[in-house]
Amino acid sequence: MTDQHEKKIQACRKAVEQHPQDAEVYFQLGLACRKGKFLKEAAEAYETSIHLNPKNKKAMHGLAITYRKLKRYDDSIAICHEILKLDPDYAKVYFNLGLIYEEQGEWEKAIKQHRKALDLNPDDFQVHYNLARGYDAVKDGSKAIEHIRKAESIADRENDEKGKNESKILFLALLEKLK
C-alpha cells in the first residue's frame, strides 16, 4: 500500500468519526480501503453506507466488487441483482458479474454478462479484452480475435500503453493457438 492510500484511509476514518451519519463518508472509506487492500474494512464501510442510504448504487457496487475480491461470490451476485433492479443499465454491474463467473470458471455465463456490459458501453477496452479471454476459453478463436482487435483499437485510440501491450500479448497467444 502506498503512502497516498494510507493518508486517504486515515482521512476517511477521521471523516467517519466526525460525520457518523453521512453515507458518503462511509462510501469514500470503503473505496479507499478497497484500493488499499483492506477488504474486510471496505466491506464494513460499504455496508454502513448502504444502511444509511439503501439506494446508493455506488456503495452497493463497491460492496459487490469487495465481496467478489473476498470470494464471497453468492453475496456479490445477490447485490449485483439488487442494483440491476434499481438500474438495469448499470454496465459496470454486468462487468462485475462477468468477472465473478470468470473467477468461477463459468465462461459461458461470463461471456453473457460481458456482452450485456458491451451492449451498454461498446467502447470499453476491458470488456472487449475479457470477451476475448472468454471466447478463447470456450474455444471460439475467431470471436476471441475479433474482440482483442477491438480492445487493441480502443487502447490505441485512447493512448493506453498498458492496454496496447496487454492486447498484443493476448493477440499473439491467440494467433499461436490457431496455428
Identify the meaning behind each predicted range:
Residues 35, 69-70, 103, 137, ...:
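Register position in tetratricopeptide repeats
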Residues 125, 129, 133-160, 169-172:
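TPR/TPR-like (Sel1-like) alpha-helical repeat modules
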Residues 23-24, 57-58, 91-92, 125-126, ...:
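Helix-start (N-cap) detector for alpha-helical repeat units in TPR-like alpha-solenoids
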